[in-house]
């Protein structure tokens, strides 16, 4: 994960001090890209321990079209707690947009099912895209989508994906985002009988919060370790039938975790 550490170093050295919605303050750069060859290992940060349970359960929650934190709470995942209302609702965030985007004529569009069908029937299409940025519903969302738009690409029997992330919390959020989309590529590839290719991450406002600076320096002092390997133990009938126990991460030997406050 040298790419990730190089980005963190770049933000520290070149970032512009900026105010932000949370009032915390950031060092920020605009426009950065990283490429991860998924054949080389699963891109899970090793210079601190990442909470893999949260990453997997959150993705399964998205895939189910869920926007209430009850499922997450049942599985001891607290990453969305700060944004939920008193009933646990978050409004029409990722899961709703991915699985039931509201069309003007009243239809509900299942973008992910459409992607699976496109990959199987027309893998050379340049329109294999999912968007969470629904302008008409942004004001109803507890948090506007940070990872907003992603596209799939097939070449030589390998499935690649590029994500555009309009806002990126480099220390806390980005390791989750990279691992989550890498996991999605593996799942999608399995469902479509493809090998995995690259995950390409593209960031807009890419920042370190002012209260994450010391933690970033600590992480940069650590040497990255060998990437782990993802094992999917069975092939379910559809993309939406995976369970938490279907996944093993072999050989994950990270440095200790580093605590940091969340900017809300």
Swiss-Prot record:
GO MF term list: thymidylate synthase activity
Matches recorded under SUPFAM superfamilies: Thymidylate synthase/dCMP hydroxymethylase
Residues the record lists as binding dUMP: 21, 126-127, 166-169, 177, 207-209
Pathway(s) annotated for this protein in UniProt: Pyrimidine metabolism; dTTP biosynthesis
Active site: 146
Gene Ontology cellular component annotations, sorted alphabetically: cytosol
EC numbers, comma separated: 2.1.1.45
Binding site for (6R)-5,10-methylene-5,6,7,8-tetrahydrofolate: 51, 169, 263
Catalytic activity: dUMP + (6R)-5,10-methylene-5,6,7,8-tetrahydrofolate = 7,8-dihydrofolate + dTMP
Keywords on record: Cytoplasm, Methyltransferase, Nucleotide biosynthesis, Transferase
Pfam family, one: Thymidylat_synt
InterPro entries tied to this protein: Thymidate_synth/dCMP_Mease (IPR045097), Thymidate_synth/dCMP_Mease_dom (IPR023451), Thymidate_synth/dCMP_Mease_sf (IPR036926), Thymidylate_synthase (IPR000398), Thymidylate_synthase_AS (IPR020940)
Biological process per Gene Ontology, one example term: dTTP biosynthetic process
Protein localization: Cytoplasm
Source taxon at top rank: Bacteria
Similarity annotation: Belongs to the thymidylate synthase family. Bacterial-type ThyA subfamily.
Subunit details: Homodimer.
Physiological role: Catalyzes the reductive methylation of 2'-deoxyuridine-5'-monophosphate (dUMP) to 2'-deoxythymidine-5'-monophosphate (dTMP) while utilizing 5,10-methylenetetrahydrofolate (mTHF) as the methyl donor and reductant in the reaction, yielding dihydrofolate (DHF) as a by-product. This enzymatic reaction provides an intracellular de novo source of dTMP, an essential precursor for DNA biosynthesis.
Descriptive protein name: Thymidylate synthase
